[in-house]
UniProtKB/Swiss-Prot annotation:
Gene from which this protein is expressed: hisA
Name recorded for this polypeptide: 1-(5-phosphoribosyl)-5-[(5-phosphoribosylamino)methylideneamino] imidazole-4-carboxamide isomerase
Keyword terms, alphabetized: Amino-acid biosynthesis, Cytoplasm, Histidine biosynthesis, Isomerase
EC number per UniProt: 5.3.1.16
GO BP terms in the entry: L-histidine biosynthetic process; L-tryptophan biosynthetic process
GO MF annotations in UniProt: 1-(5-phosphoribosyl)-5-[(5-phosphoribosylamino)methylideneamino]imidazole-4-carboxamide isomerase activity
SUPFAM superfamilies assigned to the protein according to its UniProt record, in alphabetical order: Ribulose-phoshate binding barrel
Pfam families from the UniProt entry: His_biosynth
CDD domains recorded: HisA
Recorded family membership: Belongs to the HisA/HisF family.
Biochemical pathway: Amino-acid biosynthesis; L-histidine biosynthesis; L-histidine from 5-phospho-alpha-D-ribose 1-diphosphate: step 4/9
Keyword Cytoplasm: yes
Length: 255
């Protein structure tokens, strides 16, 4: 299980939202490409990017930052936010992006996801953002009556790379993950799952290690890294396979 640092973009800046609320936004000083480069030096194996402006409006406005990140780092980039067409996906791939995340478009046009996952096998990720178990769309501004678990079951027959599942109620809180939600997803799919939302400490990371053998591939972390709750190097030490035997999951510490 890998830690995947997150860069959320608004107006070309690194930001974090609290529970997905655009009115509760915190800006960070580093330029996005500088932040990505720093995390690569710290030992990140991937970079996760969300274009929040595009997620909200459907129109990409942060391509300059995305291109610069792709040119700056030598590790794979996955990106989501407002990706709703094959043309947009091909454009992002041309920038050097490795994988794309389809969220709103996946829910509104399942056949498109099926076609694109066949055309680009292993490069399409389905992002499912949920509040109280039900899916939210359009940058979390619209709430549906669709259960996240139902969507996961439906998409599990497609040739997608992974699911990214975000619990909106914990996102940006630093108060811990929703383990029951993560478990409910892992129980119904054989496709790798990446969890997002709520990690605020090394203990929170340790609590997820037990899900690795059930298909938890990675965990996305943003605010905790920006606010220096722990470093990527510390996280990698916890999550690396060779340290699993040293971890006491009952007391949440590692030797």
């Amino acid at each position: 299980m890998d830690l995947i640092p997150a860069i959320d973009l608004m107006n070309g800046k690194c930001v974090r939202l609290f529970k997905g609320d655009f009115n509760k936004r915190k800006d960070f000083a580093k330029e996005p490409h500088e932040q990505a480069e720093f995390w690569e030096r710290e030992g990140a194996k991937y970079i996760h990017i969300v274009d929040l402006d595009a997620a909200k409006t459907g129109s990409p406005t942060n391509d300059k930052s995305i291109k610069k990140i792709a040119k700056t780092v030598n590790i794979p980039i996955q990106i989501g936010g407002g990706i709703r067409s094959q043309e947009r996906i091909e454009q992002l791939f041309s920038y050097g992006v490795e994988k794309v995340i389809m969220g709103t478009s996946a829910i509104e046009n399942k056949e498109l996801v099926k076609d694109l996952s066949n055309k680009f096998p292993g490069r399409i990720i389905v992002g499912i953002d949920a509040k109280d178990g039900k899916v939210s769309t359009r940058g979390w501004l619209e709430q549906s009556n669709i259960f996240a678990t139902d969507l996961v079951k439906e998409f599990s027959s497609f040739k997608i790379a992974s699911f990214i599942v975000t619990d909106i109620n914990t996102d940006g809180t630093l108060e811990g993950t929703n383990e029951e939600f993560i478990k409910s997803i892992l129980e119904i799919t054989d496709i790798p799952v990446i969890a997002s939302g709520g990690v605020g400490s090394i203990s929170d990371l340790l609590s997820l290690v037990k899900f690795e053998n059930s298909g938890l591939f990675g965990v996305i972390v943003g605010k905790a890294l920006y606010e220096n709750k722990f470093t990527i190097n510390e996280a990698n030490n916890v999550l690396s396979a060779e340290r699993l035997n040293d971890i006491d999951l009952n007391t949440n510490y590692y030797a």
